[in-house]
């Protein structure tokens, strides 16, 4: 009970929580995240340190490493179950005004989201069928225009960079 009260206090300023299914959409997270947004990046790869090193000290990103669970329970959809469990946990203490989004192409989340919407009709829960970068930049016309004009290979390469400086260095190296 005390932990729930502490979490309610801790999360009262959060307006949006994004749960990222990295197995499905990757590890790409924009450098700048709005101050009232919290990102839960679920990770199952035990050898991922290099890709996520920039996220470790970011107060807007919580890294949820489930690689130990994956070792113990070799079954399909482990990450999906962990994300839905965390979503259910979050619903117990976040404000009803807090928007919670799962970023994943996996439609399997839709049934869980529908069930939770019926159980908690005032909660704002949804799934975005793409990467967090696309979700976050969805309204940015310049970003969408540029990304729509590049091929899949280059798009994946651009989205793999977590820091604009490293992307600029890589592009300068190519030129």
Please tell me what each predicted stretch does.
Residues 10-15, 73:
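N-terminal start-of-chain detector that recognizes signal peptides
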Residues 1-7, 82:
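Charged, flexible boundary elements
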Residues 29-32, 52-53:
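Short, glycine/acidic-enriched capping/hinge loops at junctions between secondary-structure elements
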Residues 13-15, 36-38, 95-99:
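A general structural motif
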Residues 5-12, 30-31:
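Short boundary motifs at domain starts and secondary-structure transition points
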Residues 16-22, 38-46, 102:
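Short, hydrophobic beta-strand segments that form beta-sheet elements in well-ordered domains
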Residues 22-30:
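Short acidic, Gly/Ser-rich segments with clustered Asp/Glu that frequently serve as metal-coordination loops
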Residues 45-173:
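Nuclease catalytic cores that cleave nucleic-acid phosphodiester bonds
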């Amino acid at each position: 009970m005390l932990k729930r009260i502490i979490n309610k206090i801790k999360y009262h300023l959060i307006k949006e929580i994004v749960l990222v299914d990295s197995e499905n959409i990757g590890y790409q997270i924009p450098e700048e995240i709005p101050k009232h947004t919290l990102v839960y990046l679920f990770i199952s790869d035990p050898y991922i340190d290099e890709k996520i090193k920039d996220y470790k000290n970011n107060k807007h990103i919580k890294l949820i490493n489930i690689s130990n669970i994956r070792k113990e329970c070799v079954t399909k959809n482990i990450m999906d179950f962990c994300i839905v469990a965390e979503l259910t946990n979050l619903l117990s203490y976040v404000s009803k005004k807090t928007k919670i989004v799962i970023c994943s192409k996996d439609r399997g989340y839709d049934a869980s989201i529908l069930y939770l919407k019926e159980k908690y009709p005032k909660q704002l829960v949804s799934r975005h069928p793409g990467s967090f970068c696309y979700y976050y930049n969805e309204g940015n016309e310049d970003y969408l225009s540029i990304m729509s004009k590049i091929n899949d290979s280059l798009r994946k390469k651009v989205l793999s960079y977590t820091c604009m400086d490293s992307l600029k260095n890589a592009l300068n190296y190519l030129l």
